[in-house]
C-alpha cells in the first residue's frame, strides 16, 4: 500500500481522516484485499496487502507522479508521498486519535502493518510513555513511538539536529554551532520501520522535516 492519503485527497479534496472521506479510503483497502483473494484463487499463490513504508519509493514515486501528472497542490507538490495508510506527517492530530484512526487500516493489512506516533524527549515523563504503550497494546496491532536522539561531535550538542535549506538543498545542521558535516553529526530517525543512523535522500529528508509531534 502506498499514498492512501494522496489518493483520497485527489479524489475527494479531503484528508482520509475527514469523516466524510474515511469510508472511501477503507473501501479502497477492501477492494485491494478482494483483488488479493481473487489472485490467490486464480494462481494458487498467496497474495496479501502489506502496509509498507518502503524507504526508497517515497521519493521515487513522488518524482514519477510529478512527471506524469504535474504538480497538484496537496497531492504531488512535495518530494515524498505518504507511507501506506498513515495520517499525513504534517497533519495535526494527537497520538491516541492517530492510533485509533490507523487501527482501522491495520485490520485491512493482513500482510503486515505498522503505525507511529512522533513524541519529544520523554525521559522525564515515563508515565505518559506507559500510557501510550498501554493504548497501543489495547487498541492496535503494531505501533512504535518515534523520538529523537542526536549528537554533534564538533561541539558536544546533545539534542535535536535540525533540517535547514542551504543553496536549494535540505541539509542537517547543529543548532548550537552550525555544523553541517555529516561525518561529525550523529542523527537517528525512524524510517522504514527501523531507527536509522544514516542520512537520507532529499524526499525522505523533506518528510522528516515536515513531521509534527503527536504529544
Where are these regions (language model features)?
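Long, C-terminal-biased catalytic regions of enzyme "large/alpha" subunits
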Residues: 1-215
Amino acid at each position: 500500500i502506498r499514498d492512501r492519503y494522496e489518493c483520497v485527497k485527489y479524489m475527494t479534496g479531503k484528508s482520509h481522516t475527514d469523516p466524510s472521506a474515511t469510508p472511501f479510503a477503507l473501501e479502497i483497502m477492501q477492494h485491494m484485499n478482494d483483488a488479493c483473494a481473487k489472485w490467490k484463487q486464480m494462481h494458487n499463490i498467496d497474495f496479501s496487502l502489506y502496509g509498507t513504508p518502503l524507504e526508497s519509493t517515497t521519493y521515487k514515486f513522488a518524482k514519477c507522479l510529478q512527471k506524469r501528472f504535474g504538480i497538484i497542490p496537496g497531492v504531488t507538490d512535495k518530494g515524498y508521498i505518504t507511507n501506506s495508510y498513515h495520517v499525513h506527517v504534517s497533519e495535526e492530530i494527537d497520538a491516541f486519535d492517530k492510533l485509533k484512526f490507523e487501527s482501522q487500516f491495520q485490520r485491512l493489512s493482513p500482510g503486515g502493518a505498522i503505525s507511529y506516533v512522533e513524541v519529544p524527549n520523554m525521559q522525564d515523563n515515563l508515565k505518559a510513555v506507559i500510557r501510550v504503550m498501554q493504548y497501543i497494546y489495547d487498541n492496535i496491532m503494531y505501533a512504535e513511538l518515534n523520538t529523537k536522539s542526536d549528537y554533534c561531535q564538533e561541539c558536544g550538542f546533545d539534542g535535536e539536529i535540525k533540517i535547514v535549506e542551504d543553496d536549494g538543498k535540505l541539509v542537517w545542521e547543529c543548532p548550537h554551532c552550525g555544523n553541517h558535516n555529516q561525518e561529525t553529526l550523529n542523527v537517528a530517525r525512524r524510517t522504514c520501520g527501523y531507527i536509522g543512523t544514516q542520512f537520507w535522500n532529499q524526499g525522505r529528508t523533506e518528510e522528516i522535516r515536515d513531521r509534527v509531534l503527536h504529544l
